Amino acid sequence: MKRWHINASLFAGALLLFAGWNDPVSAADKKYTIALIPGLTTDAFYITMHKGAQAAATALGVDLVFQGAPKFDPEQQVPVLNAVIGRKPDAILIAPTDKTQLVSPLKNAAASGISVITVDTFIGNGHYQTGTGDADFPLSYIASDNILGGQIAARALAKAIGEKGKVYVSNVKPNVSTTDQREEGFKLEMKKFPNITVLETQFNDDDANKAAAQFQAVYARNSDLAGVFGANLFSASGAANGVRQSNAQGKVKVVAFDAPQSIVADIKAGNIDIAIAQHPAEIGFYGVVTAYAHLTGQSVPPLIGTGFTVIDKTNVDDPNVKKFIYSD
């Protein structure tokens, strides 16, 4: 999948100039409303994304509406989406909680004239504006390259365990686009390490307590367990709790995907060894800027990628790294 890496500040600056160039139907004469629907409202990742989106909205004179469900669940997200569609914003930025179940309601949004952009997660296969399939209608997908993120996590864990031993993935549930890809990238990269055995993935339904219990069960069956990759916040924090409860700190290495304050605290406490931080503020910022670009008549790329920062005990207090720790 090809990635478009665009400097957010330059992109926003170009748009601000565009607003000044445009004629009477420009953004200066119309107040746009953009809705941001996160995967869930209580996760530090999405809170940080909201802050990035708000920064762009303020700079561009856009009204930003933030509304979501408290749980990462399509059954809870779809009613929120339908309510937002009823208010007829100019654009919707959404982190779909299922790559198939959100297709139909998002089609309804697009059919009603609302521009649709997905952030963090995608629908279908994430390839938009191709003219093929029933889920290519969103304008753009803005996110981390999650396959690459999984590969980075695998390399970090392999190094931490001396490139040998048993590991497993603690994951949410199947059919979540981002975590599916992180697991895919992790397993793909681990094939390069013949002395590492990847055990069966443990799905925890985004429940940290369940992830902790699963760690204890896997560890009981595999006393030589060397590492765990937590594919999202609750998977990683649950695995870390399991490590602590099993007195396995130092013996079993934990790599976390995402870097809220709680994960940082676990790094400092020795329960988590490494965190792969996404840049959610950039995702939110790009989302608003991309929506604004489209609404003001500019073409936008169908895919925009953001980066990662690897955090461990050696750099967790470095100011250049701390800025990528998520907001609570």
Each language-model region and where it sits:
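Bacterial N-terminal signal peptides
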Residues: 9-20
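Bacterial N-terminal signal peptides that target proteins for export
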Residues: 1-11
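A residue-level marker of the well-folded mature domains of exported/periplasmic proteins
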Residues: 26-328
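Basic/polar N-terminal segments that are highly enriched at the extreme N-terminus
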Residues: 1-3, 19-28
